[in-house]
Amino acid sequence: MIDKYGRSIDYLRVSITDRCNLRCIYCMPPQGVTFKTHSSILRYEEIIKIVEVGTELGIKKVRITGGEPLVRQGVVNLIKELRKIPELEDITMTTNGVLLPKYAFALKRAGLSRVNISLDSLNPDTYKTITRRGEFSQAIEGIKAALEVGLNPVKINTVVMKGINDNELENFVNLTIDKDLHVRFIEYMPMGETSLLSGNYYVSLNEFKEIIIDKMGMVPVNIQNNGPSKDFKVPGAKGTVGFITAISHNFCSTCNRMRLTADGFLRPCLASDVEVNMRDEDGKISSEGVREKFEKALLLKPISHNFYKNDFFPKKNMSQIGG
């Protein structure tokens, strides 16, 4: 699929649930959110149909997200069924890692290519502050499980927040020296009710990037198909370090993705409230209708995101859209 700005759209992020076993401060407001009812969430067979039509239109890569995708029953079988779609080249997942010790082997066997694990602190107390309920040791065991079964490359997603974890970047870089881990520092993005805290949390990664690169002696590396990340590594290290600067230096000109929410809405841009209902008027998912909705969303994809423009923030929280 080619949008009106000449960008090739071949990547679909699929949220399968808005529920999560953590309550991260940048993903959900303190009071929590009202979760979608079971009947409003797309059934797995509906997700498969949407992906099948998407691949006919040019989708080659799917990332399974949440909420936390591993809290939804049957996710391993979903991966297995998606792997049967011949045009689908890559199936990945973003997870907080807590349940990976239980599911990593089965996910790998089902056909999952690799995982991104959200880990925002290497300090157990700070980790609990950020997640509001998580145990740091469980996340670490999840990373170990992913490495052991070969869900490679294992990427660590770290949202950098001012005054919370911005003093830990060097420690994260050190993770990549002896382990085949690929840390990606991500700028905080204001979403939904959590956007009220954006003035407290947001910090441009440009303030840290050059300092860390110089201090750690990192050199640039070119990793194919690594999305918006600008990548570096410490010479001799097993892993790499990436910087994703969605706010300070956006990558909209090369954006290749759309997002499918757990309740069946296709969003052409994360930082926009524009979305297309993939269900027909009768509430069903049809191949013809899905094709039309993809084409409609393609036309609605903006030239760039709207973060901070005229004080705009997306109305939905990240957990409701899909992380």
From Swiss-Prot:
Its EC number is 4.1.99.22. One of its GO terms (molecular function) is 4 iron, 4 sulfur cluster binding. Its cofactor is [4Fe-4S] cluster. Keywords: 4Fe-4S, GTP-binding, Iron, Iron-sulfur, Lyase, Metal-binding, Molybdenum cofactor biosynthesis, Nucleotide-binding, S-adenosyl-L-methionine. The keyword Transferase does not apply. Binds 2 [4Fe-4S] clusters. Binds 1 [4Fe-4S] cluster coordinated with 3 cysteines and an exchangeable S-adenosyl-L-methionine and 1 [4Fe-4S] cluster coordinated with 3 cysteines and the GTP-derived substrate. GTP binds at residues 13, 63, 94, 155, 257-259. It holds the Pfam family Fer4_12. The keyword Coiled coil does not apply. [4Fe-4S] cluster 2 binds at residues 252, 255, 269. Pathway: Cofactor biosynthesis; molybdopterin biosynthesis. [4Fe-4S] cluster 1 binds at residues 20, 24, 27. GO terms for biological process: Mo-molybdopterin cofactor biosynthetic process. Residues 4-228 form the Radical SAM core domain. It catalyses: GTP + AH2 + S-adenosyl-L-methionine = (8S)-3',8-cyclo-7,8-dihydroguanosine 5'-triphosphate + 5'-deoxyadenosine + L-methionine + A + H(+). It comes from the Bacteria. Gene3D superfamilies: Aldolase class I. CDD domains: Radical_SAM, Twitch_MoaA. S-adenosyl-L-methionine binds at residues 26, 67, 118, 189. NCBIfam families: moaA (TIGR02666), PRK00164.2-1 (NF001199). Monomer and homodimer. Belongs to the radical SAM superfamily. MoaA family. Catalyzes the cyclization of GTP to (8S)-3',8-cyclo-7,8-dihydroguanosine 5'-triphosphate. This is GTP 3',8-cyclase. It comes from Petrotoga mobilis (strain DSM 10674 / SJ95).
